[in-house]
Amino acid sequence: MFTTPLPPQKRLSTQTEAIAKNITAIRSLDWDRDRFDIEFGLQNGTTYNSYLIQADKVALVDSSHEKFRQLYLDLLQGLIDPQRIDYLIVSHTEPDHSGLVKDILQLNPRITVVATKVALQFLDNFVHQPFERIQVKSGDRLDLGQGHDLEFVSAPNLHWPDTMLTYDPATEILFTCDVFGMHYCSDAVFDIDLGKIAPDYQFYYDCLMGPNARSVLAAMKRMDNLGTISTVANGHGPLLRHNVGELLHRYRHWSESQSKAEKTVVVFYVADYGYGDRLSQAIAKGITKTGVGVDMVDLSSADPQEIQELVGHASGVVLGMPPLQANADLSTNFGAVLAAMQPKQVFGLYESYGGDDEPIDPLRTKFLDLGLREAFKVIKVKDTPSESTYQLCDESGTDLGQNLIQAAKIKQLKSLDSDLEKAIGRISGGLYIITAQKGEVKGAMLASWVSQASFNPPGFTVAVAKDRAIESLMQVGDRFVLNILEEGNYQILMKHFLKRFPPGADRFAGVKTQTASNGSPILTDALAYLECEVASRMECSDHWIVYSQVTNGRVAKAEGLTAVHHRKVGNYY
């Protein structure tokens, strides 16, 4: 008898918590990662947070992902009769927060939706039915009674163009949706263990908010005019209460560092069309790894004058293909991009996979004819984006950024003190190749900055440049193999892995490998190997110091010696 195995059941649960007088958090806990979007790279699941404010008037702040439809709606109806809800505040219309808006409107057609102008436009296209609405902007208020006089703060591009924050002075709670969030699933409602959540908090920022650093600073400047913020009620992960000051400071510090970049790239996408927003985030993350600044702009809602100013001052432009049958505003903005492009700027193009993309090849030809430099091959998307697609986008962005800063790096190297660099160059280390695989994504890197750091458990550190492709595979919890090269028998492997690989290329083509128990490749010709797991990371200027614990290892040649890398100067590898 033949039976078809049932797909594994997703671990979904819900949770409620009274977080202040009259305010209840409704948390939808998604314990398993099932998306390839780049910000889910740490694979710690996520939560979708919604909030119910019950004063003289009742407001629901955001909803949940459609995968929680029955769980969420049953829980909501157990808390309150939906007919009593006066307002549905939509902070942002991405489906993971607004996936149940239509269901809530069906439960209570008289509810009034409160959102920004752009959010209401997106909702019209999503809901396809009339609904009561209030359009709000920064400084507008909504009085629910009993001191809950809500104030709204516009926060466009964090990370969608429609985002807004909501402040409740009665409880000193700031409702922020994606901002100050993290993809971290836990029963803990609040940020009790800062050390445990810190890597996820920064990774989420790097993926979604870092490419919008200027917008982050603009939003935080508006936040400065609010009252005391005692709790950040975010849309993903634990709420911030115990470490509010520290975690807000980190956002400000990271964003100030990003905004000081000497060179910038404008990354254009069309929100709510295909996978353009997700692909653009991956490209932007790759760019920011190199220290180049990014401005992310939604073509469907931007101002043409703003577009021309941004493009005019930028060193490069990345453009996602908009729909062929564009509306008038989108066509105007697309034309503004083309008109503002200048010779010698670098460019990159990618398909949005929205079903009606503008043809990409004629636009590439036009840019080349204008004298623009192509930073990476056009990214053509012929199927739902996979892990490999996002890796290609990330590495393409890194290539673009490295292209822009290459001349500045050479100039900086020449200006360094020669005696100092010669002295530092006398620090020697062994030769190793780090190999890693996570899902479909593989990576490798030649390394010499490796040092044992602990006996029990056995562990070591390795320095990884921020702009290395493998950096994204060496986050806390990731597994990899440290391949130790043999003296007198390392040249072939070293030469292979020193090559500059194009974005998305297979680093292991033509190399003999076997698979370690942790899933990463072992180089068959290595002297020895260690299977490792990343335990922690420390940021050090242009590198990450990655501390890893060893879980397994083997020596292939007992008499072999580790290859040693001797340098003469210390300003490059």
Curated annotation (Swiss-Prot):
<keyword id="KW-0560">Oxidoreductase</keyword>
<keyword id="KW-0285">Flavoprotein</keyword>
<dbReference type="InterPro" id="IPR001279">
    <property type="entry name" value="Metallo-B-lactamas"/>
</dbReference>
<keyword id="KW-0274">FAD</keyword>
<feature type="region of interest" description="Flavodoxin-reductase-like">
    <location>
        <begin position="424"/>
        <end position="573"/>
    </location>
</feature>
<dbReference type="InterPro" id="IPR036866">
    <property type="entry name" value="RibonucZ/Hydroxyglut_hydro"/>
</dbReference>
<feature type="binding site">
    <location>
        <position position="178"/>
    </location>
    <ligand>
        <name>Fe cation 2</name>
    </ligand>
</feature>
<dbReference type="InterPro" id="IPR045761">
    <property type="entry name" value="ODP_dom"/>
</dbReference>
<dbReference type="InterPro" id="IPR012349">
    <property type="entry name" value="Split_barrel_FMN-bd"/>
</dbReference>
<keyword id="KW-0813">Transport</keyword>
<comment type="function">
    <text>Mediates electron transfer from NADH to oxygen, reducing it to water. This modular protein has 3 redox cofactors, in other organisms the same activity requires 2 or 3 proteins.</text>
</comment>
<keyword id="KW-0288">FMN</keyword>
<keyword id="KW-0479">Metal-binding</keyword>
<dbReference type="InterPro" id="IPR051285">
    <property type="entry name" value="NADH_oxidoreductase_modular"/>
</dbReference>
<comment type="similarity">
    <text>In the N-terminal section; belongs to the zinc metallo-hydrolase group 3 family.</text>
</comment>
<keyword id="KW-0408">Iron</keyword>
<protein>
    <recommendedName>
        <fullName>Diflavin flavoprotein A 1</fullName>
        <ecNumber>1.-.-.-</ecNumber>
    </recommendedName>
</protein>
<dbReference type="GO" id="GO:0010181">
    <property type="term" value="F:FMN binding"/>
</dbReference>
<feature type="binding site">
    <location>
        <position position="94"/>
    </location>
    <ligand>
        <name>Fe cation 1</name>
    </ligand>
</feature>
<feature type="binding site">
    <location>
        <position position="236"/>
    </location>
    <ligand>
        <name>Fe cation 2</name>
    </ligand>
</feature>
<dbReference type="Pfam" id="PF19583">
    <property type="entry name" value="ODP"/>
</dbReference>
<dbReference type="InterPro" id="IPR002563">
    <property type="entry name" value="Flavin_Rdtase-like_dom"/>
</dbReference>
<dbReference type="Pfam" id="PF01613">
    <property type="entry name" value="Flavin_Reduct"/>
</dbReference>
<feature type="binding site">
    <location>
        <position position="92"/>
    </location>
    <ligand>
        <name>Fe cation 1</name>
    </ligand>
</feature>
<keyword id="KW-0249">Electron transport</keyword>
<dbReference type="GO" id="GO:0016646">
    <property type="term" value="F:oxidoreductase activity, acting on the CH-NH group of donors, NAD or NADP as acceptor"/>
</dbReference>
<feature type="binding site">
    <location>
        <position position="96"/>
    </location>
    <ligand>
        <name>Fe cation 2</name>
    </ligand>
</feature>
<dbReference type="GO" id="GO:0046872">
    <property type="term" value="F:metal ion binding"/>
</dbReference>
<comment type="similarity">
    <text>In the C-terminal section; belongs to the flavodoxin reductase family.</text>
</comment>
<feature type="region of interest" description="Zinc metallo-hydrolase">
    <location>
        <begin position="43"/>
        <end position="236"/>
    </location>
</feature>
<dbReference type="InterPro" id="IPR008254">
    <property type="entry name" value="Flavodoxin/NO_synth"/>
</dbReference>
<feature type="binding site">
    <location>
        <position position="159"/>
    </location>
    <ligand>
        <name>Fe cation 1</name>
    </ligand>
</feature>
<feature type="domain" description="Flavodoxin-like">
    <location>
        <begin position="265"/>
        <end position="401"/>
    </location>
</feature>
<dbReference type="Pfam" id="PF00258">
    <property type="entry name" value="Flavodoxin_1"/>
</dbReference>
<feature type="binding site">
    <location>
        <position position="178"/>
    </location>
    <ligand>
        <name>Fe cation 1</name>
    </ligand>
</feature>
<comment type="subunit">
    <text>Homodimer.</text>
</comment>
<dbReference type="InterPro" id="IPR029039">
    <property type="entry name" value="Flavoprotein-like_sf"/>
</dbReference>
